[in-house]
Amino acid sequence: MSIGGDWQKRRVGNLEGLGGIDRRTFVKLSGMSAAALIFGLGPFTEEAVARTRFSDYPFSLGVASGDPLPSGVVLWTRLAPNPLAEDGKGGMPPLKVPVYWEVAEDERFRKVVRRGKGFARPELAHSLHVEVRGLKPAREYFYRFRAGSELSPTGRTKTAPVPGASVGALAFAFASCQMYEHGYYTAYRRMSEEDLDLVVHLGDYIYEYGPNEYVAQSGNVRTHNSPEIFTLSEYRNRHALYKTDEDLQAAHAAFPWIVTWDDHEVENNYADEVSEVDSEPDQDPVVFLGRRAAAYQAYYEHMPLRRASVPTGPDMLLYRRVTYGDLAEFNVLDTRQYRDDQATSDPERQDPSRTITGEEQEQWLFNGLATSRAHWKVLAQQVFFAKREPDEGESYSMDAWDGYLGSRNRVLKFIQDQRIANPIVLTGDVHNNWAAELKANFDHPNSETLGVEFIGTSITSGGDGAATPGPDQQAILEENPHIRFFNGQRGYVRCRLRPELWRTDYRVLPYVKEPGAPIYTKASFAVEAGRPGLQVVSETAVPSRASSLIESDAKRIRAQESADERRRGGRR
């Protein structure tokens, strides 16, 4: 079957006759959203309420909370008695279903402080996003849902302190890149056992590939449940597949999350309205906008996000700011939706007009940094920020900030000119742990250090990994003296901060091919307030399965190119 024919058979909506329209027309054609136009979502008019009897346990995808404020938090669940139903509806009827929720100060719900009723509606895959208000700041709470006679698991959450309030400490973890096929989510189980206030997810929550298209060096251990995803039902099912994992559910239930996306929530290396260069039908921008609308809607449906992030067709507001008293302010960035296309040459990447954030988001970031009263100004974002000069014969990553020098230079110049104190950049994407100092001029190692960047490894993506640098990574460390640390194992990064000190611990697993791995701290770094730069606290030898399984950038790119080749071969 041809690629085009396969797409035509699997898509939900009808794209015929839409060629040549622009984004504005695309969105206006739908009174509700572009997703409704392309993927067959009509406005909900059925007022009947389903009798709440389920074919199986409806809370199969767990519970979650997110985007904490001093007075409240978002509570999330999705009713899905058959979570992997092929139509993407989770085994639910096309009717709204009442869901009751309650929040208590104790785990046994003896002191309930808030309760209410919402409706899980089919147009949002029977997901529920409850924006609870009236809670006390900096408090632990417990929550649960009820639908019919079924009770959800209990979740724990915590509100943020009041902006400007004196806060003595904060503990959080950040994570990214959880390719389902590459390993087990033991890292999330270990994370759920930590004493944390918050989790920050930096993207690649799902991967779009078909079964065994993207193969880890250590081999795949689980299998995606459908070919590459394009339609709303398929994106819904992929999110559901990932969320059926009990370790991931445990981490969601244990802490509030702040989430942002990278590329694989839609498609590898997409840039704004530009699809990855391949032979798929979404090379047509109109088709890609339809795909993006489906992906964005499914993302919203499965994340604890506020109404401000409800997508309008192929557009969704995800960048936002979360404040923890006077201690930390998180500027959560979106480096996918507004970026210029990736550069194809060195002169192009050096073009000062190029942007990875878009002008509006960049100005929003600058305004936030300039007015923040927090001790620590955090940029929670996706791709490598510091310069990473490659080894001889390799090229810069055009997908990272190295491919958008204008954007990076403007951010660093603003930090330097405005004397922004204590900026910290948090990064995912590259499937390895790194730590770097941010220089006023990366070409001059003795130039002023303006801040630091902590780059976190993947939860599973890339397979088992290795504890020590290989030749490629060693060359990068030698070429880039501002990059101070490397580790290639899986895990997450834990950060514990006080007004005077930020401490980062790289938490790693010896393997992910099998469940149940122990967790170790490979290295710890400290940053003193007012003294930007990395201080090594400790670095320890930890167990590792092999030294040859590091997924370098080159290997990762080759593996994803191989995935494209397998996909094309499977569709001939």
Region locations from a protein language model:
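Metal-dependent phosphoester/phosphodiester hydrolase catalytic core
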Residues: 2-572
